[in-house]
Amino acid sequence: MMSVRCKASVTWINLLIIMDVRVLLQPAYLLHSLPFQNTSLLVDFFTLDYGRVRAVAKGARREKSKYRSLLQSFHPLLISFSGRGEVKTLGALEPGHAAIPLKGERLFSGLYLNEILCRLLHNHEEHKELYKNYQDTLVALQGNTKMELVLRKFELNLLAELGYAINLEEDCQSHQPINAYCYYRFTPDVGFELIEKIEDGEKNSRIFRGIDLISLRNLEWDEKSSEKAAKRLLRLALATHLGEKPLNSRSLFTSHR
């Protein structure tokens, strides 16, 4: 049965699609853009109040377009858009505060964030807390904070925001606290199950040490093995929702290493 909150969300989304919406100077970040028709771009934005918004930037590919210099990843923007249907028309576009420059591996990490947001967010669903997390993550990537730690924190927050939080506190069967000295089998969207021994032929990718789960829960790890386990776990958890199509950002990162 659909919850009252879910029904309200669906109704709001339907209204945004049906109504001739006009939104002025909404804080946003560009997630992705594609050529559209002869001179335009089809752009996906992550906005503060409306979540993911897809809009046509008319004439954006023309050399003298007012949009050309501003439609860049990691540049805080203020966007205006209007129109009916899923795809809106981009109006005024202004810079927000200073751009967040990312370089090298941190640039590819930022592109990875944009790609998974594009894959997982539905149009016109508000995610204010996630928007703030995204912005904070970009700032953290710009600084000296350990990159893997920054990414794992965002991935955990993203899954929680979408209703797929990973319970790193307890075994999903017995509800006993995770034991640092035990091994657990992970099932996406279900949780961790204590195992007495690893069966012959069982995929090790789903097996995790309790100490590694506790390290991820605390978002701190001293051992390289804990860092690798955290990455493996989040990749498993996200894969269920991202689908089978490979991520372009991962391919780009691999090709430039």
Language-model segment annotations:
Residues 1-2:
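Methionine residue identity
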Residues 12-41, 46-257:
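Non-catalytic alpha-helical scaffolds and adjoining flexible linkers that form interface surfaces
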